[in-house]
Amino acid sequence: MKIRAHHKIATAAACVALLASACSGSDKPQSTTAEGFPETITLAAIPAENSSDLKASYDPLIKMLEKQTGSKVEFVQASDYAGVVEGMIAGNVDLAFFGPFAYVVAGVNGAKMTPLGAVIKDEGGAPGYQSYGLARADEDNINGLKDFAGKKVCFVDPGSTSGFLYPTAGLIEEGVVKSGSEADISAAMSPIFAGGHDSSALAIANGDCDAGFAFDTMVDKTMIDKGDLKPGQLKTVWKSDMIAGSVFAANDALGPEVIDKLKTMFAQDANVKSFEEEGFCEGDACRITDERAWGVVPVTDADYDGVRHVCDVTGSEKCKG
């Protein structure tokens, strides 16, 4: 498979090193705040798009956490899923924002963590989203996943739920590929890892890929709002089942009392309405993560069993870490 330069192994290694050096580490003794939280809380995430300032989309959440915990929140932008997973396993990350696939893989690899809540697009909504199979609107020969056979197909990242795992399951169900192995996928098409959901969509729009995958909001809203895509420029030829939402998780090393407090905090106060009331931000600037989420709602580990099932269907090596 082809992988863009910024997703090479050296970059992944550098990412892990960054997490190791920049973070205080949950496994290291440190004093606590008056509220009972570590003096420094490390929050790690990766961009769903090629963002140079991911932190800005977390600012309202960071302000809320710092006010309620009395802690200094240290934000770390990782370059790929592997860095965040390794940081959590190593105890160098206290809180992390995971795609569903990365959350499951982190657990498989031994990360001890508890889900704090999953993001929702709008107030009152359910935590979940879909993967889209995409082609250019003027491409008459691609109208479903079967038509991806023999084509240049953009995936996002080997650790992406909606950019790799669910698409692979769909391709297997349509008989396009035999399994989720690199060899079987490469035998059926020319796969390219674009590195981001926006990069995947742009590569399709620009003709660098004949077809590909990205998650729904990135194509339906984010890129159109930014002017990167025109309405109707791409067509959706496939939609996955609903995928459990991207999730904030806490390192179990924080302890059950702290984690319970964080669960309540995320459920009650990690949302646009609360951020605005506190004066942390206004309007769309209050939407958090680069998924532009309205807020966070409670979830359990069992909510991610659907992802585990798709791992079983695909037999993907990536599900094993």
Curated annotation (Swiss-Prot):
GO terms for biological process: phosphate ion transport; transmembrane transport. The keyword Membrane applies. Keywords: Cell membrane, Lipoprotein, Membrane, Palmitate, Phosphate transport, Signal, Transport. PROSITE patterns: PROKAR_LIPOPROTEIN. The complex is composed of two ATP-binding proteins (PhnC), two transmembrane proteins (PhnE) and a solute-binding protein (PhnD). Part of the ABC transporter complex PhnCDE involved in phosphate import. Responsible for phosphate binding. PANTHER family: PHOSPHONATES-BINDING PERIPLASMIC PROTEIN. This is Phosphate-import protein PhnD. It comes from Mycolicibacterium smegmatis (strain ATCC 700084 / mc(2)155). The gene is phnD.
